[in-house]
């Protein structure tokens, strides 16, 4: 008698909530960067937001091409969480710095979009932490005794 095959419930990245949150994060960060560029804000504002846009594009490309499943040497969800924490700190500092002094309206709008980036980044971090907590994979997954016998 044939053994039952495992049903894999695989949803492509483009249709997942993670993709929606990352895309929203990318759009809001790009909007913040555009406002900073148009307002000729201080260079650190533009550089930090540009750096964040580059990292988000890299992560979206990584997940779209399923390279996180191919390159097993890194634990990608943990790197994504660390990136989200660092992005939250940097964008919070940039947004507060843009809103505190009396600046132009465009810089203030860029700061507001920076705060929206922080909110999207926290949501992305919470989503990744939930994935780490409830669905571990790879060498970090707890294996049962029956899984060890099958190997």
Curated annotation (Swiss-Prot):
Question: Which spans are transmembrane here?
Answer: 19-39, 45-65, 74-94, 107-127
- Give a brief account of the tissues where this protein occurs: Both isoforms have highest expression levels in testis with relatively lower expression level in liver, spleen, lung, brain and heart and barely detectable levels in skeletal muscle and kidney were barely detected. In most tissues, isoform CKLF2 has higher expression levels than isoform CKLF1.
Organism domain of life: Eukaryota
One GO term under biological process is: leukocyte chemotaxis
The record's annotation in Pfam families points to:
MARVEL
MARVEL domain location: 13-133
Q: Which UniProt keywords apply?
A: Chemotaxis, Cytokine, Glycoprotein, Membrane, Secreted, Transmembrane, Transmembrane helix
Select a single GO molecular function from the record's annotations and give it.
chemokine activity
Glycan attachment positions: 142
- PROSITE patterns for this protein: MARVEL (PS51225)
Keyword field contains Transmembrane? yes
* Cellular component annotations (GO), alphabetically ordered: extracellular region; extracellular space; membrane
Keyword Secreted present in the record's keywords: the answer is: yes
Role = May play an important role in inflammation and regeneration of skeletal muscle. Essential for embryonic development.
Q: Please give the family membership noted in the entry.
A: Belongs to the chemokine-like factor family.
UniProt-recorded name of the protein = Chemokine-like factor
Task: Please name the source species.
Answer: Rattus norvegicus
Encoding gene per record = Cklf
């Amino acid at each position: 008698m044939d053994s039952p095959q495992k049903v894999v419930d695989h949803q492509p990245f483009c249709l997942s909530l993670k993709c929606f949150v990352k895309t929203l994060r990318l759009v809001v960060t790009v909007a913040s960067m555009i406002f900073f560029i148009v307002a000729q804000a201080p260079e650190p504002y533009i550089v930090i937001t540009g750096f964040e846009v580059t990292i988000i594009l890299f992560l979206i490309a990584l997940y779209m091409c399923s390279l996180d499943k191919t390159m097993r040497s890194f634990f990608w969800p943990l790197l994504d969480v660390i990136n989200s924490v660092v992005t939250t700190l940097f964008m919070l500092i940039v947004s507060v710095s843009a809103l505190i002094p009396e600046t132009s309206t465009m810089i203030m709008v860029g700061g507001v979009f920076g705060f929206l980036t922080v909110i999207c980044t926290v949501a992305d971090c919470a989503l990744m932490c939930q994935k780490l907590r409830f669905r571990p994979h790879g060498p970090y997954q707890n294996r049962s005794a029956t899984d060890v016998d099958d190997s």
